[in-house]
Amino acid sequence: MSRGRALTLFVSLCTALVTVGLVNAPPAAAANSAYVFAYFTETPNGNGADYGLHLAVSQDGLNWTPLNQNNPVVTPTAGTLGLRDPFILRKQDGTFVILATDLNGTDFGQNNQYLHVWDSTDLRNFTGYRRIRMHNLNTHTWAPTAFWDASRGQYGIVYSANNGTDVFMVNYTSDFRTVSAGQVYFSPGFPVLDGDVVVDGSTFYLYYKNLSNGLLYGARSSTGAPNSYTTYTSGLRQGSGMEAPMLVRNNAGTGWWLWGDSYSPVNNDYYAWSSSNVGGDSWTVMNQRAYTPPLNAKHGSIAGITASEYNGLVSRWGLPNWTRLKSSNFPDRYVRHADYLGRIDPYPFDPYQDQQWRMVPGLADAAGVSFESVNFPGRYLRHSNYEIRLDANDDTATFRADATFYRVAGLTDSAWSSFRSYNFPDRYLRHFDYLLRIDPISTATDRADATFRVTS
């Protein structure tokens, strides 16, 4: 055989082997391009409390859409029959585990050594429900978070407990069924609550609440080992009472968000910060225009998901059949009815259903829209003497015209929406002194007052 022919055969054989290797190689894991939020719900007077597992999805990690009509997708069947503080972890094999506090309601004096646990391949189905005992102390087991510890080849489950003071405990596990004995994970010399552990490369970050001053802080460690963390940030808070920090890296890997659950001056409000450098003390308060938490969401967790998983969740659980309208220039306020008048009020409030609308084809022109109340079906937002009221549809031509609007690009932000009156086409839906009306629009303030985000 000539050297040239031998070389040709050798190259052909190598090419074939490479081709076979490529064909038989396992497919790479799809990149995360969306997010899922796990939470339970409460409202200021308890009207919206539900202690099952709720899910919401988001394309951008900031503006959220509740699934399953904001009803729970699964509820505990043992222990207290309720949960708080659900945490979603994507495991090393790509599947999910869900952990949650075993507490149905707000009796925080209950002692409970257990956590709820579910397995899921896709968050469309939940299997293997169980409770796992974390310790035998006469105390609680609150706010679980979990992470992969590569040096141990195990997962760490961190939670709030009290061993004479409020500390974080940790148990290690390979299967979320059998756990090691609990040990103190973080006890910085002052009481702490609600830890969240995130691993970024070789650095472990632990965000927590300092119960002595009520502020949120970040600590870090190069090993993630128990009692190895050092606090590196200044204290953070929005509102007057905040807990449950959630540290989230965006899917692009270019930045971070920190969420905090505010319970005072009114229960059930989320605030957020952003940073391009989680390792620095450089958190910036985000304008509430930039984010919309899930309706009534409390102390939860956020995980990245793929486009396929996002579509699967929407297909399985469905999108809301209602909308909300968020004010552009008062982004803590939402359109609602009160005493049959239209207005914008700071969220959260009860009845929370006052802000939910079915945006239906316009009563006078199907190319427009009308807003039917969710909790007063048959009543619509309509103008009367240019003021917006919630009135029953009397099926007259006048009512249908008064209750119809054309949705157009937002007058102050084209990514948002404005609503032009059907029968007074020079006037737009806007707020003035927090009351809704239709007015001609001429100034920058007018345009801002007439711009809303259609959200859920």
What label would you give each PLM region?
Residues G4, C14, D60, D122, ...:
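Serine/proline-rich low-complexity intrinsically disordered segments, especially terminal tails, linkers
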Residues A31-N321, T404, S414:
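Carbohydrate-active catalytic/glycan-binding domains of CAZyme proteins
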Residues A16-L17, N45, H431:
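General secondary-structure propensity
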Residues M1-A30:
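Secretory targeting and sorting signals
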Residues L9, Q288-R289, I441:
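Composition- and surface-driven signal marking solvent-exposed, interaction-prone regions
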Residues G318-S456:
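Lectin-like carbohydrate-binding module/patch detector with strong preference for beta-trefoil
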